[in-house]
Structures are given as C-alpha cells and as structure tokens.
C-alpha cells in the first residue's frame, strides 16, 4: 500500500520502511514496518479508502464538517473510525453521522468488552462482544420432526 500510495500521488512524510528487529526485545523473526504517514492523496484513492491492517495512516484536509463526513464515508468499508476534537459534544454528533461499526471520540481502542464490536458495509462479518457473541459464534439449525 505504501508503494501504491506513492503511485497515486501521495507523499510519505515518515516511515514507509522496514524496521530493524529486534526492537524492545521483540524477536528478529517477522515483518516489521515503521509507522507511516502519507499525505497528498485524493480521499477516493485506494490507499485512502481500503482497509490497511498495518501502521499506515493517510492525512486529508477539509473545509467543512460536511466535507469531512463525506470523506469519512466515501469508502466501501466501515470497521472503525476516530474523531479528535476540543468539543466532545460536537464530536459525538459527528460520530453519529459516520458509517462505521465503532467510533472513538478523543480516544482510540478504548472498549468495554461487554459491548458489540464489528464493522459495517464490507467490513467485518457481524458483531462480537457481550451477548452478541452468542449469536456471532453460533450457527442455528431448524429441525422439524413429524410426530407419529
């Protein structure tokens, strides 16, 4: 995705290269990538709209709250999002307009395991967490028996 981001016109501000291991006593086996920040992409670019399960973020400027909502929702995915603001009430209202399974306001990865977690659109396959897990990890079978 980093190479694709460059091909799509993005500029890597930091990261984008392999990290040398071991780092902080992490074994040397494995793939390690430095956290990467990319700017200069269209908000419709693949690098900006696809789920990258790695330490990569894209930056996008906006001129209005509605433009920011449109950008956030202009993807076929919707696993999670975050809003950072000095006005928590406004952040909550903004989060309600986002098409994502979970939105963090002024925090990240803060979650009560008793609540459901999962994406919308093409993200995830349902909800896990709390009572929802029983359905998420179960397969129902309807059995009809004719009594003699």
PLM features: residue spans?
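General beta-strand structural signal in soluble alpha/beta enzymes
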Residues: 12-15, 105-107
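Conserved C-terminal structural/oligomerization subdomain of aldehyde/semialdehyde dehydrogenase
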Residues: 25-148
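Alpha-helical packing segments of well-folded alpha/beta enzyme cores
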Residues: 1-2
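Short, solvent-exposed loop/turn elements at beta->coil junctions and helix N-caps
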Residues: 16-25
């Amino acid at each position: 995705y980093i190479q694709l981001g460059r091909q799509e016109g993005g500029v890597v501000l930091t990261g984008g290269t392999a990290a040398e291991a071991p780092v902080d006593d992490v074994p040397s086996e494995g793939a390690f990538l430095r956290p990467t920040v990319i700017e200069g992409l269209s908000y419709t670019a693949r690098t900006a709209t696809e789920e990258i399960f790695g330490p990569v973020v894209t930056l996008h400027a906006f001129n209005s709250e509605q433009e920011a909502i449109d950008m956030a929702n202009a993807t076929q995915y919707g696993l999670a999002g975050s809003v950072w603001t000095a006005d928590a009430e406004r952040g909550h209202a903004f989060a309600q307009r986002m098409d994502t399974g979970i939105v963090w306001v002024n925090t990240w990865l803060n979650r009560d395991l008793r609540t459901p977690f999962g994406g919308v659109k093409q993200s995830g396959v349902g909800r896990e967490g709390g009572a929802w897990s029983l359905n998420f990890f179960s397969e129902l079978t309807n059995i009809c028996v004719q009594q003699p």
